[in-house]
Amino acid sequence: MYIQTQFASLLLLAGTSLASQVRKYNFTITSQWSSGDGHGRPVFMINGQSPGPLIEADEGDEIEVFVDNQLAAETTMHWHGIYQIDRPWNDGVPGVTQYSMQPRDTYTYRFTVQQQYGSYFYHGHFGPAFADGMRGPMWIAPAAWRPRPYELISDSSHDVEQMKKAEKHPFHVVISDWNAEPMDILLVMYRDTGIVPWCSNSIVLNGKGRTYCHSAELIESVGGPGRNTLGCLMQPDQELYSNEQVCEATQTDLEIFQAEEGHEWIWINFIHSGAHHELQISVDEHEIVVVAADGEFTYPQRVHAANCNLGERISILVHLNQKPGDYAIRVTSLRQEQVIQGLGILRYPGSSHGAQEAEPPATKPWVHLNGTLISDKLQQMDEMKLAPFPSRPPPPQSDHTLKFFVNMTGTGSWALNIGPHQAFRQQLPPLLWEEDSRGVTTYESDVQGGSMQNGSVVDIIFTNGANVNSQHPFHKHNNKAWVIGTGTGGFPWDTVDEAIQQGGMADSFNFVDPPIRDGCRLGNTTGDWTVIRYDIAFPAASMLHCHMIHHFGAGQQVVLLEGVESMAKIPAEMKDRVHSNFRPPLRYGPLD
């Protein structure tokens, strides 16, 4: 078993710096009409805004969020990337860790932010609520004792101090693709017809954006033929089942990142809470320095563009070393299904523009409209080289191995191994304490039948199945994991050790400095594989799922029971909450 000696030593080093306070927030969730990108539609709001309010805390603080559900439907709130160390019932997953909040119901989430820092976010976890606006940013300020990688960026003490100043005043931007219709409507259409909801109206930054209508010639030159006026690839029989999608340009406000006087660097946290599109981040005429991923410091990468997948966070520093003025921040889709780009504005201190002026500046981009770099001399972020700073190698061996074969098992049905995680399970008594709610998508043991005990190390091997040509951005609740290997051609071995000893695959794995994330990417091609390794540091019922909305909604989810032999007693008030007495339907499948 692997003991978290590194975390323990860091906590001892912190000493009295972990004196904490309680950060209290009140959230009221409503559905309101909104037109952030110029097209009106119902949106889930938190305190009248989407994204919701920023939650800020220091390491060691307790966060308390009172949530008032004023919707006509059930809901929960998940704290994406946050370790639910002491109170696993506050992870916000209906049917797994809690009963959902009924309409006009309330619930208070309480958790302590321990052993982590940086950029996170919260979002609804009942159905596709996060894709319809129920989301917001979180920032856990890194403790003063934590090492920073700034001296690897510049040997100037002045620059290093400016980077520290930027870190203390970060910008937070929730980025996402944005559809013309509510996502539950689009998912029902997907279930019945197989038409994927990939055609977005806009890419929004903090809920702001525009629909840009490009010429057919430009769209075809960067994306190829067979596209509509929104740049979307048309799907077979799409015109029979979905509303016609015609590009209608809008002129709404853009998000402005106004640098303060005296600041020579700025820090921006990009938080991807979208539904379908992987996004490419770039700032016109500026190199960007990637300094953190999924909250934690990394060895810096100085690049011209950085990709950010669904559920991920990428934190960058930008040196304000160009002529003062406005520069476009571009967030561009990397998915082949649609040619689409969103814009924000980086504004230098003392810019002559008025505070409300938000026209896209005519600055030089680093990327084409399809997200590719305009020159092979430019640098793209390499996500597999985002090594943690300071170095934190993974455990050398694992105690358990789980293997998941990703496959499409029918129209509108995705599975990890045996079958989809049915949507009705979010209305069952939570499986955290109710064993009868645990189905074939609940995993209590590894491939050898051993239970995953507290303190043990787990490998998860993902393999892309037959007839699958779509990538999968997975998210692991409650743990960060080292992404120790990726490859092609399938993974026929039962364990990583077998792959190395019997398959000669040693060069396919990194046990020295792999990235550590709360998710991973499984490649697009049949036979692609990814292996992650993590340690079970506290008991939990942890969901593992694809964050692409139609995969998530169509059942590509499992629940892992980790360290449950050490589980704290579930409070009686969790079990006694008002809830629906639900009997599963006869139909077996997602979105029931």
UniProtKB/Swiss-Prot annotation:
PROSITE patterns from the UniProt entry: MULTICOPPER_OXIDASE1
Plastocyanin-like domain mapped to chain residues: 32-142, 173-350, 445-563
Cross-referenced Gene3D superfamilies: Cupredoxins - blue copper proteins
Binding residue positions for Cu cation 1: H78
SS bond list: none
CDD domains tied to this protein: CuRO_1_Abr2_like (cd13850), CuRO_2_Abr2_like (cd13876)
Keyword Coiled coil: no
Localization terms from the record: Cell surface
GO biological process, one term: melanin biosynthetic process
Family: Belongs to the multicopper oxidase family.
PANTHER family registered for this protein in UniProt: LACCASE-RELATED, MULTI-COPPER OXIDASE
UniProt-recorded name of the protein: Laccase PFICI_06862
